[in-house]
Amino acid sequence: GGPAAYSTYTNTADFGAVGATLESTSKGLGGLNTITQFSKAVDSPTSSVRISNSRVSNDYGSLGYGALPAPAGLAYGAAGASYGASLHGAGAYGVVRAAPAIAAAPALAYGARAIAAPAIAAPALAYGARAIAAPALAYGRGLAYGGAYGAALAAPALAYGARAYAAPALALGARAYAAPAIAAAPALAYGARAYAAPAI
């Protein structure tokens, strides 16, 4: 409330004295963080008086210090790197940031980042072997030896690890050996190395 800045200047009422009074107030956004200065100088035939006062209020700072009671259902987590597997193959690196699930009032933090959003773990970008459902395309090593590009003609393969193999694979370039697929059934691979045998 009020104006952002104002100043007053007043002369003394006594004709025998010479003096002045100055008051200045500057306010921040929303009337917070005020700077108030007051000075008074009076010179009379018998005395000389100088008074100066300066006040600064940092209203935002009081919100970030001290222990605040946490409302029920409020969860905090530290930001960190997570390593996990994804639909696309090898480990997925990402950053998971946990934030309050329920915010009762605005919170301001100094030093660490605060994100006011529910913490939801989403699939992270992964680098490694690709596995796409029906047909599964794989890049990496074939069933036997050597790197190969291949198109799986059998069932979809879902890879949850470093390496996943779907049979059969059509090799383009390097040597790759694959057993023929007889029936179409989904091959699920979980782990560092998993091999999908032909489904009969």
Swiss-Prot record:
Disulfide bonds: none annotated. Coiled coil: none annotated. Sequence repeats lie at residues 98-101, 104-107, 116-119, 121-124, 133-136, 154-157, 166-169, 178-181, 184-187, 196-199. GO terms for molecular function: structural constituent of cuticle. InterPro entries: Cuticle_C1. It comes from the Eukaryota. Keywords: Cuticle, Repeat. Component of the cuticle of migratory locust which contains more than 100 different structural proteins. This is Cuticle protein 21.3. It comes from Locusta migratoria (Migratory locust).
